[in-house]
UniProtKB/Swiss-Prot annotation:
Its main location: secreted. The lineage of its organism: Eukaryota, Viridiplantae, Streptophyta, Embryophyta, Tracheophyta. It is found in: Secreted. Coiled coil: none annotated. GO terms for molecular function: cellulase activity. This is Endoglucanase 3. The gene is GLU8. It comes from Oryza sativa subsp. japonica (Rice).
Length: 499
């Protein structure tokens, strides 16, 4: 393992003329370490396994069936559709919206490289954005959760069988939820960019809704988990507050509309909303790092001089991940994996890799580098770091294990996922009751349904992965793990001539 760590450091510390060979914008020479195109295909396919609602004729994950067809009916609202966020049967609006923002961003930045996978990626975005339109159909209201998490987690059953309460929770002026509402606005705005050319009418509808939802989020301020704590915590509490989502939402609306109103909003409120906070963890809860990268693009690529300070804010985040520089603040395992938290760490690996590649794209366009404590860091070097992280995920690690289900010869077989771990309805038409399913949860048998493309939480700090279904911290997949990975894989597949 020490050797792997040394090789990792060597890869990211090479002079840029050597790093360019590893991760230049131009095509690579020599064999690719992995089949990135195959991984891309599978990373998008995963979303079909997470679908809730009436499945379309084009559904490729055939062992899944219709589910949640009465969602919202208890309050006479149509909330059918969307995605189950992870291995349960819940629709949590906060991580769902973030997943759609990141999946849309993957398409916006790298969709032009996806070729035959582009339509599948668009379909995945649309399945989510259609649901978010339903969740925001009523002014000054966002329906943010379907299902009682405590009751859902007391059962282990297929989504097609679920009989737990499908309680609906919302934010409105009396129960504000700025964080989840602003994230929903960001998702709608980002999705509008995906469909701007292929479906202009749909894109216009998305951006109009994004504007309305953001206005509501900004006007009625409050953290959604304050009032809804018994229902959304400890699952998806908003630990970082709502300031990051307001900045993030404004950034996406500025990018989607080019309306100077949002530019003014960012300029006037950026510091108050934490633009320069040194929080270097980017995920479903804290969006500061993503917002800094996104806003920096307006300066680097679109030459919006008023946002010049965001180049420095973005550089600060990027430099925190560059090993061997005075600004390095990121922990890596001995095998070379970026390690933030033990619970679902792979989400930070994929989101950070995406931001590294995206920022490298912006820097290359503007012919700029990053100064990390006086050390010049090139776009090629950022790409090298990102590629090493993706390679680790795909199997270049001490265990020789791919953490993407269905990719490679060795991958997790006992993932923490109800639908995957229980027989499909086709194989077992009889209902499997709430408590009956727990036999599968604690079984050592491989999941009968392979959830192709699912990326699990990943190994621990010692690069070890037990592959136990009951170990949700390491064995559970989630939409927000896959969403940014889609963009990273598209870039890598293209750079190696696989697309």
């Amino acid at each position: 393992m020490a050797l792997l760590r040394c090789l990792f450091l060597l890869a990211v510390l090479l002079p840029h003329r050597n790093a360019a060979v590893v991760a230049a914008a131009s095509p690579h020479h020599g064999p690719a370490p992995h089949d990135y195109r195959d991984a891309l295909t599978k990373s998008i396919l995963f979303f079909e396994g997470q679908r809730s609602g009436k499945l379309p004729p084009s559904q490729r994950v055939s062992w899944r069936g219709d589910s949640g067809l009465s969602d919202g009916s208890s309050i006479k609202v149509d909330l059918v559709g969307g995605y189950y966020d992870a291995g349960d049967n819940m629709k949590f609006g906060f991580p769902l919206a973030f997943s759609m923002t990141m999946l849309a961003w993957s398409v916006v930045e790298f969709g032009g490289l996806m070729k035959g996978e582009l339509q599948h990626a668009r379909d995945a975005v649309r399945w989510g954005s259609d649901y978010l339109l339903k969740a925001t159909a009523h002014p000054d209201t966002v329906y943010v959760q379907v299902g009682d998490a405590n009751r859902d987690h007391a059962c282990w059953e297929r989504p097609e069988d679920m009989d737990t309460p499908r309680t609906v929770y919302k934010v409105d002026p009396s129960t504000p939820g700025t964080d989840v509402a602003a994230e929903t606005a960001a998702a709608l705005a980002a999705a509008s960019l995906v469909f701007r050319k292929s479906d202009p009418a749909y894109a216009s509808r998305l951006v109009a809704r994004a504007k309305r939802v953001f206005e509501f989020a900004d006007k009625h301020r409050g953290t959604y988990s304050t009032r809804l704590s018994p229902y959304v915590c400890p699952y998806y509490c908003s630990y970082s507050g709502y300031q990051d989502e307001l900045l993030w939402g404004a950034a996406w609306l500025h990018r989607a509309t080019k309306n100077p109103t949002y530019l003014s909003y960012i300029q006037m409120n950026g510091q108050v909303l934490g633009a320069d906070e040194q929080d270097n963890t980017f995920g479903w809860d804290n969006k500061h790092a993503g917002a800094r990268i996104l806003i920096a693009k307006a300066f680097l690529v679109q030459k919006v001089a008023a946002l010049h300070e965001y180049k420095g804010h973005a550089d600060s985040f990027i430099c925190s991940m560059v090993p061997g520089t005075p600004t390095d603040q990121t922990q890596y395992t001995r095998g070379g994996l970026l390690f933030k938290l033990s619970d679902s760490n792979m989400q930070y690996v994929t989101s950070s890799s995406f931001l590294l590649l995206t920022y490298a794209k912006y820097l290359a366009f503007s012919k700029t580098t990053v100064s990390c404590g006086g050390a010049a860091v090139t776009p090629a070097r950022l790409r090298a770091i990102a590629r090493q992280q993706v390679d680790y995920l795909l199997g270049s690690n001490p265990m020789g294990m791919s953490y993407m289900v269905g990719y490679g010869a060795k991958y997790p077989r006992r993932i923490h996922h109800r639908a995957s771990s229980l027989p499909s309805v086709a194989a077992h038409p009889a209902r499997i009751g709430c408590s009956q399913g727990f036999t599968a949860l604690y079984s050592g048998v491989a999941n009968p349904n392979v959830l192709v493309g699912a990326v699990v939480g990943g190994p621990n700090l010692q690069d070890q992965f037990p592959d136990q279904r009951s170990d949700h911290e390491h064995s559970e997949p989630a939409t927000y793990i896959n969403a940014p990975l889609v963009g990273a894989l598209a870039y890598l597949a293209h750079s190696y001539g696989q697309l």
